[in-house]
């Protein structure tokens, strides 16, 4: 039998071929590690807002830029271990990864909490994601 850490990338890729996947916070980190990236500790940012910069397309189409977003975490994706199959699609002004997308499949991760009242335009992000189709 496969251990969970071995099965997770297989599960994410198989499901992500059929339906869009969105990992938020720990789910974002799970997607990042599933494809080979590393997670590191950082200073806790629980209930804090920061500006996030994005490319104003895909999930971020029509979203303010920078986006004021709520963060609740003490772990982050280690940027120099970004898997070759993933694109960084949003980050903080000091380069912390805030969103990723798989290059071939509709598999996304958000480090911040789009569902939080502390995230401006969070409803737009969720609407954009829910309207995505598998190509």
Locations of regions flagged by a protein language model:
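Acyltransferase
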Residues: 116-135
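Catalytic beta-strand/loop cores that center a nucleophilic Ser/Cys/Thr
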Residues: 56-104
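Cysteine-nucleophile active-site neighborhood
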Residues: 7-62, 68, 126
């Amino acid at each position: 039998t496969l251990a969970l850490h071995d099965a997770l990338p297989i599960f994410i890729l198989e499901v992500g071929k059929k339906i869009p996947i969105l990992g938020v916070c720990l789910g974002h980190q799970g997607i990042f590690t599933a494809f080979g990236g590393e997670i590191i500790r950082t200073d806790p940012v629980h209930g804090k807002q920061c500006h996030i910069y994005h490319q104003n397309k895909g999930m971020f189409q029509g979203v303010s830029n920078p986006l004021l977003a709520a963060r609740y975490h003490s772990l982050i994706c280690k940027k120099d271990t970004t898997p070759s199959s993933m694109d960084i699609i949003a980050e903080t002004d000091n380069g912390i990864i805030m969103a990723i997308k798989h290059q071939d499949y509709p598999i996304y991760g958000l480090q911040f909490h789009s569902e939080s009242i502390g995230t401006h335009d969070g409803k737009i992000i969720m609407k954009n994601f829910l309207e995505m189709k598998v190509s």
